Design a protein with these regions (language model features):
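Metal-dependent nuclease catalytic cores that hydrolyze phosphodiester bonds in DNA/RNA
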Residues: 1-96, 194-200
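Short histidine-centered catalytic/ligand-binding loop motif
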Residues: 2, 42-49, 118-127, 162-165
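Short, well-structured alpha-helical interface segments that form or flank functional binding sites
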Residues: 8, 95, 128-131, 135, ...
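Short, solvent-exposed loop/turn segments at secondary-structure junctions
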Residues: 18, 86, 114-116, 151-153
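Metal-dependent nuclease catalytic regions and adjoining charged, substrate-binding loops involved
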Residues: 54, 122-125, 135-200
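Coil-to-beta-strand transition motifs
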Residues: 91-95, 102-106, 142, 153-154
Length: 200
C-alpha cells in the first residue's frame, strides 16, 4: 500500500473543515483494518481512509466548528483558503500554501491535529513548525497562529508564535539553505564523506 495513513487523515480533516465540497476525492472503505481482505480488494493498492477514521474526523471537525472563537477565525468575513505563495529567503526560493488567510484579523492560520495537545510545543519544534511560521509570516506579512485539535481528547488549542519561536525558525531556514547548497550546488562535495561530529 502506497502512502501514509496519517497524511491521508490530515488531508481529509483539512478538506472537511475548509473545502467540504471536495470530499469526493477521498476513497473511504468500510473495513475493520487495512490488513483486511475487503480493504485490499477495494483499495487497489492506494492508501484509503477507513470509514471509522472518516467518522472520527467528522466528530473532530464538529467539535472544532462548535467553538465560536475557532469558527470565527476560520469562517470570518474576509478569509481565503489554501493560499499558495513563493518567497525568496537566503537567496533561495520557498513554496508555501497557507490553510487560512484571515484578512479581517490579519492572521495566517494553520490547522493541525495532534495525538497530545499538551506536547504540541515540543511537536512544533520537532516537526519544524517554527520554520514554517517564519516563512509564512515573512511572505504574508501577518502574524501566524496554529489551531490545533487533539485527535484523542478532542481538546482544542490556539498557539501563537513568539519572537524566539520565529527566530529559531529563521535559523533553521539558514541551516537548511547551507545544507542544500552543500549537497546540491557544490560540485566538489562527495556525499559519502559527509558526517556529523558532536561532543556529548
Amino acid at each position: 500500500i502506497v502512502g501514509n495513513p496519517n497524511l491521508v487523515k490530515g488531508g481529509y480533516f483539512h478538506t472537511l473543515v475548509l473545502e467540504p465540497d471536495k470530499l469526493e476525492q477521498y476513497k473511504i472503505i468500510e473495513a475493520a483494518s487495512r490488513n483486511s481482505k475487503i480493504y485490499k480488494d477495494l483499495s487497489g493498492g492506494e492508501m484509503c481512509l477507513l470509514q471509522k477514521e472518516a467518522d472520527e474526523l467528522q466528530v473532530l471537525r464538529d467539535k472544532l466548528m462548535a467553538n465560536n472563537v475557532c469558527k470565527d477565525l476560520i469562517q470570518d468575513i474576509d478569509v481565503e483558503y489554501e493560499v499558495p505563495g513563493l518567497i525568496q529567503l537566503e537567496d533561495e526560493w520557498w513554496k508555501l500554501k497557507a490553510d487560512i488567510k484571515n484578512n479581517t484579523e490579519k492572521l495566517v492560520i494553520d490547522l493541525k491535529t495532534t495525538s497530545n495537545i499538551d506536547k504540541f510545543a515540543y511537536s512544533a519544534k520537532e516537526y519544524n513548525y517554527d520554520s514554517q511560521a517564519y516563512i509564512y509570516s515573512s511572505y504574508f506579512n501577518m502574524d501566524m497562529i496554529f489551531i490545533v485539535v487533539d485527535k484523542i481528547s478532542g481538546k482544542i488549542g490556539i498557539f501563537d508564535c513568539s519572537s524566539s519561536f520565529l527566530e529559531r525558525g529563521k535559523e533553521k531556514v539558514e541551516k537548511a539553505v547551507d545544507q542544500y547548497r552543500l549537497f546540491y550546488k557544490n560540485n566538489d562535495f562527495d556525499p559519502a564523506q559527509y558526517l556529523v561530529t558532536k561532543t556529548l
